[in-house]
Amino acid sequence: MENITIKEIHARQILDSRGNPTVEADVFLSDGSAGRAMVPSGASTGSGEALELRDGDKNFYDGKGVMQAVRNVNTKISSLLVDKHVDQREIDQLMIQLDGTENKSNLGANAILAVSLALAKASTRAMKMPFYEYVAKIAGTSDRMSLPMPMMNVMNGGAHADWCTDFQEYMLMPIAATNINEAIRMGAETFHALKKVLKEKNYVTTVGDEGGYAPKVFGGNNEPLELICEAIERANYVVGKDIAIAMDIASSEFYEDGGYKLKTSGETKTSAEMIDWYEGLLEKYPIVSIEDGLAENDWEGWKVLTERLGNKLQLVGDDLFVTNVKLLQKGIDEKVGNAILIKPNQIGSLSETIDAVVLAQKSGYHTIMSHRSGETEDSAIAHLAVGLGTGQIKTGSLSRSERIAKYNELMRIAEANPELVLKNPFAEN
């Protein structure tokens, strides 16, 4: 690619799936290739995330405008990068240096990531290869390329659904599936069965930000698990054998003054009591993964959680690690968690996203490529999951087009490359 340069960069403000502004960028190369990328946005965010630059003008999209980030792309970033030779890591590094802050608060992680991913997409066209192959090539993960086992968010709570439960996500994992099409079908059939179960119990079937049902359940945080198990059986699958359950507790959202304040019950639990609770859930339900089971600042609690349950299930750090290699390395050194959620916009560039995945994989941590609750129709994470061989993907429910876009892209990738196998990190369970 040494003869190809960046010819033009242009950004604009568009809307995400919540109707909030976000950044879209186009990158044009000297050979005529072009790439476009859209950046998502989170609702429950870790304190260590790279900064999403917002305008703060209450008279313009209630302060959520991204015109400053757009201007940063169209002026500062464009001026720096136009006529530069195409090299993903070098270009990402130039933007990081131009920003000059630890959390990308000068230019905005939303500005940098939009250009980073748009450049990657333009580069794939210049190299005449699929996006996932380009990602694998620059990451050195070609031998790991595979289709990811989906985590399908069928019931929403917490910050994604007005606190109808304290826990944020209840997900299906179709662990008996042998290919991605079958995995998606199993999830869709169970999702539709769950709608029938909810209607029979007179629960509403409106959906939350990520497309999962969000009823105000009466049985507390455990009831969605009962409902999901019933739906799995209703869809003619075997609970725990065909389809298992994953949960995102998002506990940083209700961690206050050293305790876990449950809004639904009014109780406050200690770290030890939360761990006991999870242990009880494992005995009753086929749970294979718990994300953010304790808060991002509760490192001592996380050590105990990992010690007690780390050999029984996947313990995922999201707010804990925020796709940051420094925090991940700390977790590895201190034996905290055994898996990391990968969100490109938490760190703000493709190169740094790759670094987090590679470090995790080398250290024996599971990796899960993830969307955000405020999404777009951009399907880049499907390609990142395949190219980096993350083994798992978390991209919402079986409703809402911005979620389905990623599932559809995975099926297209599978059709185009029949040699890619569906990864199943839980096959041995």
Predicted regions and their residues:
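Conserved phosphate/anionic-ligand binding catalytic regions in large, soluble enzymes, centered on
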Residues: I14-D16, N103-T124, M149-T165, D209-G212, ...
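Short, Gly/Pro- and small/polar-rich lid/capping loops
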Residues: M1-T22
